[in-house]
Design a protein with these regions (language model features):
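Early extracytoplasmic/lumenal segment of secretory-pathway proteins
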Residues: 27-101, 228
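Short beta-strand->loop
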Residues: 36-39, 134-145, 152-155, 159-160, ...
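A structural signal for short loop-to-beta-strand junctions that line the ligand-binding cleft
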Residues: 86-91, 109-150, 168, 178
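Ligand-binding "clamshell"
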Residues: 102-111, 128-129, 135-137, 248-261
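A bilobed periplasmic-binding-protein/Venus flytrap-type ligand-binding module shared by bacterial periplasmic
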Residues: 151-156, 268-283, 299-300, 308
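Periplasmic-binding protein-like
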Residues: 177-182, 290-312
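Ligand-binding pocket segment of bilobal, Venus flytrap-like solute-binding proteins
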Residues: 186-261
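C-terminal capping/gating helix-and-loop segments adjacent to ligand/active sites or protein-protein/ligand interfaces
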Residues: 300-377
Length: 377
């Protein structure tokens, strides 16, 4: 009799375990999602909140979300150190070449979205050099288009008698001490913009131009986020290499600022990838799919960013954040409605050796000699 009772108990426990295992396997997504990202909380916080709301509505699952904020080089290094056992599910933001390098190391999972959604995203954007918007091998995909441009204070520029429309306007002597920028070894947006000048003019003439810019620079900030902030507060007239959403956040906060997208300025697709060994892979894949949906792309448009696909445009009712984005960037609704100039070649800028060369040259020839450059020595 005792044996029969024991057999019944084991049968019950086995069925219970199997039921729970099957239930967890059938669950559409996990209830947690973690990012490691250089993308500002002005963007990743609304994106995570919107996804959590979406998951609750679609699957009735409460998803706990969080982000590990790290600069691009630090985030990349951290992922390498994790060695396939990451403490985050997704890497979001930075240059596509870093994602390519992680894929080569076997540290990324293929992106799993519908073929129709994948095909809607163009392979590249820009001429004469096409900037990749997705990985041909499928390990990363762009999420939104974000220009690195110039933020300025209209009233302050008017007082100085200066107009800002393109890069060379920054070299006006009237802007002496009025420009803010972040060092290229601390900011991917600054580094990419330095590369734009180096690839436009060549190594020697490009550095000559950047030294002239340094002569008008009043501050090198420690973080790229600080550049639009000091301009918004009126401490400086112009900010160099500012991501559009960072500039737009200052406008939304009530500051009188404007944004210029100069010729051949770098446009990042804000790449996203699922990390190999991600603790919550289903939630990670669902997050990517959500951001590329109409709802996700509309969210970006409210934050000063642009759709990654020609299918959507920045538009909304009068007075909406979407229309403020359009006005803020000079009437632009889509990068696919206009010719986009791009000289940034990832094959040149991407290798680790090149990145170190640019950063090293900057530190030795500009950062260490900045006072002399300002004095014209």
């Amino acid at each position: 009799m005792k044996g029969k009772w024991m057999a019944a108990i084991f049968l019950f426990l086995g069925a219970f375990v199997l039921l729970n295992f099957s239930s967890s396997q059938a669950q559409p997504i996990e209830n947690e999602l973690y990012l490691i990202t250089p993308v500002s909380k002005d963007v990743h916080d609304p994106a995570l909140k919107a996804f959590a709301d979406y998951a609750k509505k679609k699957w009735n699952i409460d998803v706990k979300t969080s982000a590990i904020p790290k600069g691009t080089p630090v985030a990349y290094g951290q992922i390498l150190e994790w060695k396939g056992k990451p403490q985050a599910d997704i890497f979001w933001g930075g240059e596509g070449t870093l994602f390519d390098a992680l894929a080569v190391e076997g540290l990324l999972e293929p992106v799993k979205i519908s073929k129709a959604m994948w095909d809607e995203i163009p392979t590249t954007i820009g001429k004469p050099v096409g900037l990749p918007l997705k990985d041909p091998k499928g390990f990363w995909v762009g999420t939104t288009l974000e220009p690195y441009g110039l933020i300025y204070q209209p009233k302050l520029l008017k007082r100085l008698g200066v107009e800002i429309k393109d890069w060379d306007d920054l070299l006006n002597p009237k802007l002496k001490g009025q420009i803010a920028q972040c060092t290229p070894d601390r900011s991917s947006s600054s580094h990419a913009s330095y590369e734009v000048m180096l690839q436009t003019y060549g190594w020697e003439k490009g550095w000559e131009w950047l030294k002239k810019l340094a002569a008008n620079t009043g501050i090198f900030t420690a973080r790229s986020r600080d550049v639009p902030n000091v301009v918004a507060k009126g401490e400086f007239a112009v900010g160099f290499a500012v991501p559009s959403y960072m500039a737009f956040a200052e406008l939304v906060a009530g500051y009188d600022v404007m944004f210029v997208y100069p010729k051949n300025a770098y446009v990042t697709p804000e790449p996203m990838a699922v990390l190999k060994g991600a603790p919550h892979p289903k939630a990670a894949q669902a997050f990517i799919e959500f951001l590329l949906s109409e709802e996700g792309q509309k969210l970006f448009a409210e934050l000063g960013l642009y759709p990654i696909t020609p299918k959507y445009k920045v538009q909304g009712p009068p007075g909406s954040k979407q229309e403020k984005t359009v006005q803020f960037t000079g009437g632009m609704r889509s990068f696919f409605d206009m010719p986009v100039g791009n000289v940034y070649d990832e094959k040149i800028a991407g290798p680790k050796k090149r990145i170190e060369e640019v950063n090293s040259y900057f530190r030795k020839e500009i950062a260490e000699k900045h006072k002399e450059i300002v004095k014209g020595k």
